[in-house]
């Protein structure tokens, strides 16, 4: 039987390619944001007439430079808006709409689709079983113009997830565990397929986090095999009826099992995503700033656990909370989470990548220690190159904000 990757590529190509083959493929969806969009459109202009293969299959979002922190950012947005209007692109999300990857997951991605976008964390849509892959501006411009582009066919790698999450453990810890086991380049050239033994024990938000951070693992794509959770998500969020296919075991280059009950809250310590430690090993490190959000951990359940921990408390370090989209913010506000966070002393906005890339809305200074729920912690990622960055799940981040030092969230969640 074919793997899920082979199944998707067969539907597109009419044949089953071998790993390492170079193939041209027609995407179901193409995306870009403000930071990459400028370059995408420049390349598109250099190709002659500015046109796209299918306006309905293009998604554009302002997120990295949103709201514009300087004149140059504003100029870039004006340039992109002009092209969006001229091309008649209907799926455009201006300032405040949200982060591209979250928007694609919420509104567009479907199981079995092929999605390309001009950002490395396009993999996020793999949460619903889409083959989602980030590309550079030139390749995305070609895909927009021609309706196709090339990929090197990855080898399939199987991951089985068994058991249920212990208290205080989230999808972020699965991602960090895999980084600790395989390293930052461990899945280079692989399409990772995740089979969840107990689907209801692994919610969609956590799946999105793991898919998102597969970029840090070097994966070409990471896809959760569609199951009952996928079907429920699509029905609830989109009104789409979906019946998960029966997937029989295929031939995999390698495989690995994640035992959820054996995991504990983890962190990636400076300055590498695979410098993995238990939260107990770094507990007590004083922290200047906490960031809860990003395309990695800015979804509703992430905001919910932060609010649960911070309710009735005041933060002892600066804390910035950014739901990943307008929709997440709206729901969090309706459920009272935004009030809880602001009353705790957090600064809250939505729909921006600013702190994650060290661009604005929370840039770290020299020597500062930052705990963030985002996806990268190399030098200079969140600001000054001397800032120390720890990656953690939202529960760890919230407990850390409450104490002003890295803290284990489990006592807060048990209490």
Swiss-Prot record:
Could you confirm whether the keyword Metal-binding appears in this record? yes
Q: Which SUPFAM superfamilies match?
A: Aconitase iron-sulfur domain
The answer, when asked if Metal-binding is one of the entry's keywords, is yes
Copy the pathway line from the protein's UniProt record.
Amino-acid biosynthesis; L-leucine biosynthesis; L-leucine from 3-methyl-2-oxobutanoate: step 2/4
State the EC number(s): 4.2.1.33
Instruction: Quote the cofactor binding remark.
Output: Binds 1 [4Fe-4S] cluster per subunit.
The cofactor(s) it depends on are: [4Fe-4S] cluster
* Residues bound to [4Fe-4S] cluster: 295, 353, 356
Assembly, in brief, is:
Heterodimer of LeuC and LeuD.
Question: What does the function comment of this entry state?
Answer: Catalyzes the isomerization between 2-isopropylmalate and 3-isopropylmalate, via the formation of 2-isopropylmaleate.
Q: Which NCBIfam families does this chain map to? A: hacA_fam (TIGR01343), IPMI_arch (TIGR02086), PRK00402.1 (NF001614)
**Protein's UniProt name:** 3-isopropylmalate dehydratase large subunit
């Amino acid at each position: 039987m074919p793997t899920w990757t082979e199944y998707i590529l067969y539907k597109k190509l009419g044949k089953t390619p071998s790993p390492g083959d170079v193939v041209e493929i027609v995407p179901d969806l193409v995306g870009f944001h403000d930071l990459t969009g400028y370059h995408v459109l420049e390349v598109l202009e250099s190709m002659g007439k500015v046109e796209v293969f299918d306006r309905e299959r293009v998604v554009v979002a302002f997120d990295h430079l949103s709201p514009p922190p300087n004149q140059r950012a504003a100029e870039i947005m004006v340039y992109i808006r002009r092209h969006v209007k001229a091309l008649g692109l209907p799926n455009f999300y201006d300032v405040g709409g949200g982060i591209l990857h979250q928007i694609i997951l919420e509104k567009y991605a479907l199981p079995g689709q092929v999605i390309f976008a001009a950002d490395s964390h396009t993999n996020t849509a793999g949460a619903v079983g889409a083959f989602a892959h980030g590309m550079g501006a030139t390749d995305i411009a070609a895909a927009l113009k021609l309706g196709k582009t090339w990929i090197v066919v990855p080898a399939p790698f199987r991951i089985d997830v068994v058991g249920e999450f212990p208290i205080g453990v989230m999808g972020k810890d699965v991602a960090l565990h895999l980084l600790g086991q395989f390293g930052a380049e461990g899945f280079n050239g692989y399409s990772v397929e995740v089979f969840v033994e107990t689907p209801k024990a692994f919610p969609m938000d956590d799946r999105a986090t793991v898919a998102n951070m597969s970029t840090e693992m070097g994966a070409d794509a990471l896809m959760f095999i569609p199951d009952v959770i996928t079907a429920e998500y699509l029905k609830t969020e989109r009104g789409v009826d979906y019946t998960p296919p029966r997937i029989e075991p295929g031939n995999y280059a390698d495989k690995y099992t994640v035992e959820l009950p054996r995991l504990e809250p983890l962190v990636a310590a400076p300055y590498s995503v695979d410098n993995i430690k238990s939260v107990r090993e770094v507990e007590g490190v004083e922290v200047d700033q906490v960031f809860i959000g990003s395309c990695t951990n800015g979804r509703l359940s992430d905001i919910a656990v932060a609010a649960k921990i911070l309710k009735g408390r005041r933060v002892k370090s600066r804390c910035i909370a950014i739901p990943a989209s307008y929709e997440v913010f709206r729901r969090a506000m309706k459920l009272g989470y935004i009030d809880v966070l602001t009353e705790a002393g957090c600064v809250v906005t939505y729909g921006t990548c600013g702190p994650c890339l060290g661009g604005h809305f929370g840039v770290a200074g020299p020597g500062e220690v930052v705990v963030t729920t985002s996806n990268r912690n190399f030098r200079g990622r969140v600001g000054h190159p001397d800032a120390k960055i720890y990656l953690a799940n939202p529960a760890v981040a919230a407990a850390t904000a409450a104490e002003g030092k890295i803290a284990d969230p489990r006592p807060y969640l048990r209490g």
